[in-house]
């Protein structure tokens, strides 16, 4: 599924026992690479049509890992189901270091017209859960 596509995103997070679902729509570019797939997208929140997200995702076939860089938020994630990784998120008080425990990193981009990516992970302070997230991306040419 290389080339330009429309993207729909469902972002589900649970923080402090409260679930929040955000739906976004936009455009994406998908490229087959030596390591797997490279996906870049820009999407707008369907509810307020104001907040936008720009992300760059590298999907590694051999390791089944995802490297996610959220361009507007100023942080990146290494989602590796085989290991706990770490990230730093900028806050008004400075940088916050969080551990990242990936539960699911899957994708199906081999089709000509449709594709999908699922990223499910938990952010932890030390080893204490902070929030659980599941990002589902649906692509259509």
Report the location of each language-model feature.
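Charged phosphate-binding loop/patch that engages nucleotide di/tri-phosphates or the phosphate backbone
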Residues: 133
């Amino acid at each position: 599924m290389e080339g330009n596509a429309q993207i729909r995103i469902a972002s589900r997070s649970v923080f402090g026992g409260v679930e929040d679902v955000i739906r976004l729509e936009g455009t994406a570019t998908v490229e087959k690479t030596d390591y797997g797939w490279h996906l870049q997208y820009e999407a707008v929140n369907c509810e307020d049509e104001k907040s936008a997200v720009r992300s760059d995702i590298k999907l590694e076939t051999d390791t089944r890992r995802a490297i996610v860089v959220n361009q507007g938020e100023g942080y990146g994630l290494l989602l590796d189901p085989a290991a706990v990784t770490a990230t730093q998120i900028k806050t008004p008080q400075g940088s916050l270091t969080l551990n990242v425990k990936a539960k699911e990193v899957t994708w199906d981009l081999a089709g000509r017209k449709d594709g999908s990516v699922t990223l499910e992970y938990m952010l932890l302070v030390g080893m204490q859960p902070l929030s659980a997230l599941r990002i589902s991306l649906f692509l259509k040419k």
